[in-house]
Regions:
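N-terminal catalytic cores of NTP/NDP-binding nucleotidyl/phosphoryl-transfer enzymes
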Residues: 54-117, 177, 253-259, 268, ...
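Acidic, turn-prone loop/beta-hairpin segments
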Residues: 108, 197, 201, 207-215, ...
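Protease-associated
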Residues: 266, 273-347, 356, 360
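Cys/His-coordinated zinc-binding microdomains
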Residues: 204, 480, 496, 539-540, ...
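Secondary-structure capping and boundary motifs in well-ordered enzyme cores
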Residues: 56, 60-67, 78-82, 86, ...
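Cys/His-clustered metal-coordination modules, chiefly Zn-binding fingers
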Residues: 907-943
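Residue patterns forming the tRNA-binding/recognition surfaces of aminoacyl-tRNA synthetases
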Residues: 2-32, 38, 42-46, 119-262, ...
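Short functional micro-motifs and their immediate structural scaffolds
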Residues: 208, 429, 500, 542-544, ...
Length: 943
């Protein structure tokens, strides 16, 4: 007989050919940059979005309404990418759960940023074209931006009704906006008035609160004294004995906007604050008692140089009349609750044309509005010798004039948070102009009541939007620009009547439906109004149309009507299930949608509001090209593919601000690769598995297999919980832990021998394949919402007999948790076995480090673990497979020829050389037959 150690290379190869080595058509490298577009083409050609929605019962629906991104650029920011990805993840998951979950993308196409960009490219500027021509150019710009953004959204793997998105610049949308305006006007919720509003002198338009950003700004603060007139002095003398003097008396105000002093019409005090009168340098002043010390310090007056005379309440000063230091007019003292003790003197400079609180307190005293500035922020003729000077140059001029007349007590630069225009980033002012307002106060209580019915994620969102709605003033919805939806109002030229009727609103709406809102500038008033219409007040027929357009927040804020209700067949109910946007939309789209919806239909337009944070660079700073931390979505996609970007979106706790950068992306690319390798290993070992014929019943599985299914049960349970709670980062953690720890480091590591060396059709191998089949089927479904391209690539390489006729993974259902898989008792047992395995590995590792052994199959282990002896004894036959050693014995005594001894937590492991010789087929050390293989291998070959 030939010696078994004298085996030829050909004979060794023959044994290798008997192994069940993995086979799969799934490539090792994802090659995502090339394959993802091919996958998207497959989805489009096979109408996957249509199939995803048409196969679902509309009675069981999840409607996520898309907040429209602004069309100021063809390129999207990484924050916009995050938003779209989160929406798409949710839509895909809900579809898997059996919901009818359509997605209608939207775009916001009106507004000043687009108008400004268009004007910059017009030779001769705005005045070189007609309003109609300008609007046409803006419309073309918006449509070009839409094409670019749509292409980038699709490249992210976002599925939706791309053939029929909604646009705020479409005629049908604009028509519904006009109808909402008409309904709100009819209810008395919209009015026109002269009132101070945020005004951008650079952009020459009013701004809503949502269009204002706060940034640090250096201003000059000044203290100015106003001398009381003789009548007021006599009144003070008669009221207070301590003022029985012939000295001059002054009120002192503090302001950070010296340029508004020419517009001062009053001084406000708090009726219940205490004010202290004191003498300094032979003059008498007063200041709020709580601010006196700070005031003296600011004007550099020493306390020992003043003489306190007495105190009074603010209400005692009401209607006294100091004289304006620059003009021959009086500035009466008013009582206002807005006065605080934060800074100054407790006497507030009051210019009703340049401050909302100033305006409100002056209204109570029937003091009119005075705002001598034009739309560019230049003083008008009303300002006298200041006429023609821009307000921002006025500070130094006003300060010099106050010095000249002896009214300036002190001036100093301060840095503070100041409102800036969100478009041009320049400081804004308050300016009183005729504007259209939504009178929020008339339905504020109902809006607050509706907020309480909405689920906010995170929960802090409720308080945030509630506080904003509770504290907000009237909503200024008019804008003095060209590119937007015109305010559908007419004025009678004969009697001045403001005309907004059901008839005019519907006529304009129908014209917009046919020709878009461009009709407003294209046609005359006569053509825009119903035929034969006469003024309801005077009966005349001479009309003038409104020139202002609506705030873009009003545009997008009516999408619940213009989109959700108008497309009821597709988006089949209101309120919708969810609005999902970045957190600053509490003051933007969430709020404008809430206000228009409550005003017209008495309810919130959404059931849930989910917000995510802003995206910053890897260093935690705002993204900037100059800082080198700016990263674009298409940069990541070109290098790694879209699924990496999607994986990033799922890996972060989006409720807070989020970081992204090269290092983060590289780490995610490694995780992506490991997930693919895991799936590839599973598929490779299922090449000959037919679930119809080879599936092994649960009761016939080994405990190790049952434990793997228990871990799968837990994975499905945990990721389902994560998705239902919108905590995608927990999904990511669960998936990563399952793939890296439960599978790669444990189950798959252990069963390789069984898969490769057992008989091809043996129960042992088929049992393992059954488990791997279940894991693969679940895993590819679980990764689909987040990594759909990867999931589709895997699915298209799954053997047909394992696909159940499923054309695409997009059409899959969420994995099922079979109750029998849930086995907590088995988990407790395996926790002890796993602990033992770790200790065994620690016992072997020094021998490998010292190169005394190569593979762990070269050793036998003897385990003495009294605490778990019975458990280990019950599965002793499987321990060598679990430990990946040639032999494993539950021992009471130390064996001979021990190579290493290791003890931990009451468990002692003795390591010896393995018994027998190395089987050239399975590489375990056993008793070998004449062919040089062990009996297990001989049995496997003989099948």
């Amino acid at each position: 007989m030939k010696d078994k150690l004298e085996m030829t290379e050909n004979e060794k190869k023959e044994f290798k050919d008997t192994l069940n080595l993995p086979k799969t058509t799934l490539e090792m490298r994802a090659n995502a940059t090339k394959k993802e577009p091919e996958t998207q083409k497959f989805w489009e050609e096979h109408q996957m979005y249509k199939k995803m929605t048409e196969n679902r019962d509309k009675a069981n629906s999840f409607i996520l309404h898309d907040g429209p991104p602004y069309l100021s650029s063809e390129k999207i920011h990484v924050g916009t990418a995050l938003n779209k990805i989160l929406k798409d993840i949710l839509i895909k998951y809900k579809s898997q759960r059996g919901y009818y979950a359509p997605y209608v993308p939207g775009y916001d196409g009106h507004g000043l940023p687009i108008e400004n960009k268009v004007v910059k490219n017009i030779e001769g500027g705005r005045n070189a074209v007609t309003p109609a021509e300008l609007r046409q150019k803006c419309r073309e710009y918006a449509h070009n931006s839409l094409k670019g953004q749509e292409s980038e959204f699709k490249r992210l793997g976002v599925l939706g009704n791309w053939e029929h998105p909604y646009l705020t610049i479409d005629g049908e949308y604009e028509a519904e906006q006009v109808r909402v305006f008409g309904e709100m006007y009819k209810k008395g919720y919209i009015e026109k008035g002269l009132k101070p509003v945020y005004w951008c002198a650079s952009c020459e338009t009013a701004l809503a609160e949502a269009e204002v950003e706060y940034a640090d700004h250096t201003s000059t603060s000044i203290y100015v004294r106003f001398k009381f007139d003789d009548e007021s002095v006599n009144t003070l003398k008669s009221k207070f004995d301590f003022l029985n003097t012939d000295k001059d008396m002054y009120a002192v105000i503090w302001t950070t906007t010296p340029w508004t002093i020419p517009s001062n019409l009053a001084i406000s005090v708090h009726p219940r604050f205490e004010y202290t009168f004191f003498e300094y340098n032979n003059d008498i002043y007063y200041a709020a008692t709580g601010l006196l010390a700070n005031f003296l310090k600011d004007v550099d007056w020493k306390e020992e140089d003043i003489k306190v005379l007495g105190t009074c309440k603010g209400q005692d000063l009401e209607n006294l009349t100091p004289v304006h230091p620059m003009y021959d007019r009086k500035s009466p003292i008013l009582c206002g609750e807005h006065v605080t003790l934060d800074a100054g003197t407790g006497s507030v400079h009051t210019a009703p044309g340049h401050g909302l609180e100033d305006y409100e307190v002056c209204c109570k005293y029937k003091i009119g509005v005075y705002s001598p500035l034009d739309s560019k922020g230049v003083w008008t003729e009303e300002a006298g010798d200041l006429a023609g000077i821009p307000y921002y140059k006025g500070n130094s001029i006003v300060i010099d004039k106050l010095k000249d007349c002896g009214a300036l007590l002190a001036a100093a630069d301060i840095q503070h948070s100041y409102p800036h225009c969100w478009r041009c980033k320049k400081p804004v002012i308050y300016r009183a102009t005729p504007q259209w307002f939504v009178k929020v106060d008339k339905f504020r209580d109902k809006a607050l009541e509706e907020i309480k019915k909405v689920k906010f994620i995170p929960a802090s969102g409720e308080a945030r939007i509630s506080n904003m709605v509770e504290g907000r003033t009237d909503w200024c919805i008019s804008r003095q620009r060209a590119w937007g939806v015109p305010i559908p109002v007419f004025y009678c030229e004969d009697c001045g009547e403001v005309i907004v009727t059901d008839e005019t609103i519907e006529h304009v709406a129908k014209m917009f439906e046919k020709e878009t809102s461009d009709a407003w500038v294209k046609y005359s008033e006569k053509e825009l109004m119903p035929e034969g219409f006469v003024c309801p007040k005077c009966g005349k027929t001479h009309f003038r149309k409104e020139k202002d357009i609506m705030d873009v927040w009003f545009d997008s804020g009516v999408s619940w009507r213009a989109v959700v209700e108008k497309r009821a067949d597709e988006l089949n109910h209101t309120p919708v299930d969810m609005y999902l946007e970045v957190s600053d939309q509490h003051r933007g789209w969430f709020q404008s949608s809430l206000l228009t919806s409550v005003a017209t239909q008495g309810k919130a337009p959404y059931k849930q509001v989910l917000t995510h944070g802003f995206v910053f660079g890897e260093d935690g700073r705002k993204m900037s090209k100059s800082l080198g931390n700016y990263i674009r979505p298409d940069d990541i996609i070109k290098n790694y593919g879209a699924d990496i970007l999607r994986l990033w979106a799922a890996s972060v706790d989006y409720r807070n601000d989020i970081k992204i950068g090269d290092n983060i992306v590289k780490q995610l690319a490694e995780i992506f690769k490991k997930t693919r390798n895991t799936a590839r290993f599973l598929m490779g070992n299922l090449f000959d598995f037919d679930p119809e014929k080879d599936y092994v019943n649960y009761k016939d599985l080994k405990d190790l297999d049952k434990f793997a299914l228990h871990k799968l049960y837990q994975l499905i349970e945990n990721v389902t919980e994560a998705f239902e709670g919108y905590e995608f980062y927990k999904y990511f953690q669960c998936l990563q832990n399952f793939a890296a720890v439960d599978l790669s480091s444990f189950y798959l590591d252990i069963v390789k021998d069984r898969l490769y060396t057992s008989g091809k059709k043996s129960l042992s191998r088929r049992a393992c394949q059954t488990v791997m089949y279940e894991i693969l089927q679940a895993l590819v479904r679980i990764i689909m919402p987040v990594m759909p391209h990867q999931a589709e690539d895997i699915w298209q390489n799954v053997p047909e007999n394992q696909k159940g006729g499923l054309e695409s993974i997009l059409l899959s259902s969420w994995p099922e948790m079979k109750p029998e898989w849930n086995n907590p008792e088995l988990e407790q047992e395996f926790a002890k076995i796993l602990k033992t395995r770790v200790i065994v590995t620690k016992a072997i590792e020094p021998l490998r480090a010292d190169k005394k052994v190569g593979s762990s199959l070269e050793v036998a282990v003897y385990v003495k673990y009294d605490e778990n002896k019975d458990l280990l004894k019950s599965c002793e036959n499987e321990l060598c497979n679990i430990f990946i050693t040639s032999q494993a014995v539950v021992a009471d005594e130390k064996p001979a020829d021990v190579l290493n001894e290791y003890t931990e937590d009451g468990c002692t492991v003795w390591v010896t050389k393995a018994h027998g010789e190395k089987c050239c087929r399975c590489w375990k050390y056993r008793e070998l037959n004449a062919d040089g293989i062990c009996s297990d291998c001989q049995e496997a070959i003989s099948e």
